[in-house]
């Protein structure tokens, strides 16, 4: 008997060859930058607000000109001493550092400018930062006690000086003058305990870099007028200001917003009758243009 035809061998079905798709790969859309979006919205819905605010503040506070305040390391330590303390008390603590750890270097002048809330430091040499870093914690606490919060600040000062020396070999921060502003800020904020505000104060007042330092006065005035979104934190505010201000406007804006917050736009009892911003202030009138 003839054998039956077994037919084709069984196995997995072969897929037909397909030509590769020529459609381009769809790129993921980037989320919009909230800071740039806010600035564009502000320009569209409240035109000339930034310019009007700067001009109004200048009409009563003048147009300050930049002058180097202190060497950068002294500026950094003085800024740490001002945290949650009055400027005049920070001056007392810094003077105590000068007296306890004299460096013998030439005296330098403190140019506090209009944004400073103290009397200004007398001329004097910076402290010996090597000696400060080597000081026992308990000793340093007592030296800076006039500035307030001495335990917290002494630890911060020692840690900061140590971090700078370990990275640079000494305590000088003059090298920051050669870096782009944001790169210099990033270098400083990479040190534990130094935030955008402290870094911006140092870079603005020691080198004239166009970095906005946002303290409670700047933050309060800007939120009340409507320059910043309601939910913007003080930390975020640094970058909002950089997006809305020209570099040559930053120093004037910082100094005059601080003065306005201290003298007129006070936290508890703002003096609306004296305020040149009231026509455009959303705190006075939520519908202000």
What residue ranges belong to the model's regions?
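Catalytic cores of DNA base-excision repair glycosylases
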Residues: 34-289
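Polybasic, lysine-enriched low-complexity intrinsically disordered terminal tails
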Residues: 1-42, 287
């Amino acid at each position: 008997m003839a054998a039956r035809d077994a037919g084709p061998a069984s196995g997995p079905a072969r897929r037909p060859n397909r030509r590769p798709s020529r459609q381009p790969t769809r790129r993921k859309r980037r989320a919009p930058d909230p800071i740039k979006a806010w600035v564009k919205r502000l320009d569209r819905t409240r035109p000339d607000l930034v310019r009007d605010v700067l001009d109004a503040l200048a009409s009563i506070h003048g147009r300050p000109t930049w002058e180097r305040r202190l060497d950068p390391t002294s500026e950094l330590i003085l800024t740490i001493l001002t945290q949650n303390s009055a400027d005049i008390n920070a001056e007392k603590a810094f003077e105590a550092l000068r007296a306890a750890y004299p460096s013998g270097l030439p005296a330098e002048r403190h140019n506090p400018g209009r944004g400073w809330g103290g009397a200004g430091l007398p001329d004097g040499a910076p402290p010996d930062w090597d000696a400060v870093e080597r000081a026992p914690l308990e000793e340093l606490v007592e030296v800076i006690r006039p500035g307030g919060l001495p335990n917290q600040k002494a630890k911060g000062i020692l840690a900061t000086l140590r971090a700078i020396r370990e990275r640079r070999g000494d305590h000088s921060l003059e090298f920051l003058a050669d870096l782009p502003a944001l790169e210099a800020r990033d270098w400083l904020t990479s040190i534990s305990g130094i935030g955008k505000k402290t870094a911006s104060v140092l870079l603005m007042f020691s080198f004239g870099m166009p970095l906005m330092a946002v303290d409670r006065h700047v933050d309060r005035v800007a939120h009340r007028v409507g320059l910043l979104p309601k939910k913007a934190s003080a930390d975020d505010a640094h970058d909002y200001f950089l997006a809305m201000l020209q570099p040559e406007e930053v120093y004037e804006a910082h100094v005059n917003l601080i003065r306005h917050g201290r003298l007129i736009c006070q936290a508890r009892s703002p003096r609306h009758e004296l305020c040149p911003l009231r026509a455009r202030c959303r705190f006075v009138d939520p519908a202000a243009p």
